[in-house]
């Protein structure tokens, strides 16, 4: 007999081999409707998994987020089975559940598929669902697995990783696959799904390997949930900064130049320049010292910092020079700022020292991960490093958070949460080895946030290798989560670079480094702004704030030019549309470009020294004096509206 604890701390004895489904039917069906899977001692298992030891059982129902992951993993197998029926020669690699669905990487060998094939695959998937195959788990030896998948070279490679582990396969009808699970127990539980897109992906993410076909999909328990998600995808497409950019012409990429290397076009460069000037001025008001440092460095610098050991796969190849020197494009700015601190001796009275930079960095993102401005290979980070005494940590973190919240207010960022990231105490190998340091750093961060009275969440295992961090997770207009701001405590780099200050006792002491970014990279922040505003920038950020539209270029251009000069003297960004088009066409074009104010100038305006304007998205026209219009614009800019 085994003892199982479950709902409401009940403990019952069961025959060894009893399944979660049997326990649910006997004891839990009234409390938990529509079971999907289970957790046994916090480990996910199938409903038909035989329990053979004492433990705690938790039933996962359709409403549990973990259940959606199980469903999507199972749908990946359902899709693979359908593909196998349609393309018997297809070779399957991996098919995991991901954040909003699943994908499967497949070598179709002699076949090529496209989006036109999605409906055919979905039709077979629905057929298999109706066949209601039982999905069963089977544990086999390494040798048996090698024979079972002898036809599939990809599985042979994957199996080598599990030579000394328990190997499991899952079967449903004629289909079987190498998999850890967990899955639903029958195919007819998989009903509401959609294949979404197709792309290329290297086997195991290695560009040296063959390019496979990656098919993405998603699955839900309810038909309406699927419909709602598909509608959300359509809304995302409308907000996608890559799509909006086709109209606004803010940035571009060029294959001849290289993947993930953005060009900032005039209008995008204008927005970036405004953001950069804003953030620099804001940081100067907080007593930061702004610097410029080289975009590359000797590899020795990154050996000392530890990046060569922990971050080499994300760095570009080393450049070996004739004189033996080895240089590398920097993936981070922190080692350079360590060098600035180390240039001079420091007294405890000088601290904290705040060094900031809009620092260009280069990171070797895999080709499949590069996406618009959100994932690029060249980026400029709003970076800073604060060198402080240990007794100054709390106060500095509070100042950083106040700075972040001020910036968020100006950019109208309202939906966010604080997340404290700690190391995983059960898996400390990938972190700097100093238990006392980790304890002190995590304790300090947590106490500081509590003293500020701010709500926060905790994330175990998400810390940087050199210390715990505070991330500000921003939720965009469509509910997606992204990290814009981060604060990281670092007790390691000061040791590695032997940084010191002279204390009151006239002895050398070790400072603490606080890494900090407020608006992430310029690239990611512009993408965020575009998607949040749908390209309708507030007046203070708009690349063109006012478009002057003369009704007749020959008659009204000169007066339009005078108004342009008047506005430019007040530092407004103004253009004139003097093209030989109709007035209606010019106004529609201005709307398409999402220009905040469109000013029409005709005879009435010219004779009476007036302007007639309409705001973006409005049909209402207002006629006022030029100086009144200037005052209106100034107020809007001042209010960051």
UniProtKB/Swiss-Prot annotation:
Subcellular location field: Cytoplasm
Q: Can you tell me which residues bind Zn(2+)?
A: 334, 385, 515
InterPro entries, A to Z:
aa-tRNA-synt_IIb, aa-tRNA-synth_II, aa-tRNA-synth_II/BPL/LPL, Anticodon-bd, Anticodon-bd_dom_sf, Beta-grasp_dom_sf, TGS, Thr-tRNA-ligase_IIa
Its UniProt entry gives the catalysed reaction(s) as: tRNA(Thr) + L-threonine + ATP = L-threonyl-tRNA(Thr) + AMP + diphosphate + H(+)
Protein known as: Threonine--tRNA ligase
Instruction: Identify the SUPFAM superfamilies for this entry.
Output: Class II aaRS ABD-related, Class II aaRS and biotin synthetases, ThrRS/AlaRS common domain
Q: Name one Pfam family in it.
A: tRNA-synt_2b
> Which keywords accompany this UniProt record?
Aminoacyl-tRNA synthetase, ATP-binding, Cytoplasm, Ligase, Metal-binding, Nucleotide-binding, Protein biosynthesis, RNA-binding, tRNA-binding, Zinc
Cofactor field: Zn(2+)
Q: Which GO cellular component does the record give, naming just one?
A: cytoplasm
Q: How does it assemble?
A: Homodimer.
CDD domains cross-referenced by the UniProt entry: TGS_ThrRS, ThrRS_anticodon, ThrRS_core
UniProt organism field: Aster yellows witches'-broom phytoplasma (strain AYWB)
Job description of the protein: Catalyzes the attachment of threonine to tRNA(Thr) in a two-step reaction: L-threonine is first activated by ATP to form Thr-AMP and then transferred to the acceptor end of tRNA(Thr). Also edits incorrectly charged L-seryl-tRNA(Thr).
EC number(s) per UniProt?
6.1.1.3
Q: Which family does it belong to?
A: Belongs to the class-II aminoacyl-tRNA synthetase family.
Q: What is its main location?
A: cytoplasm
Region entry Catalytic: which residue ranges?
A: 240-538
- All copies of the TGS domain together span 1-61
* Gene Ontology biological process terms in this record: threonyl-tRNA aminoacylation
Q: Taxonomic lineage of this organism?
A: Bacteria, Bacillati, Mycoplasmatota, Mollicutes, Acholeplasmatales
GO MF assignments: ATP binding; metal ion binding; threonine-tRNA ligase activity; tRNA binding
As to how many cofactors bind and how, the note says:
Binds 1 zinc ion per subunit.
Q: Does the keyword Isomerase apply?
A: no
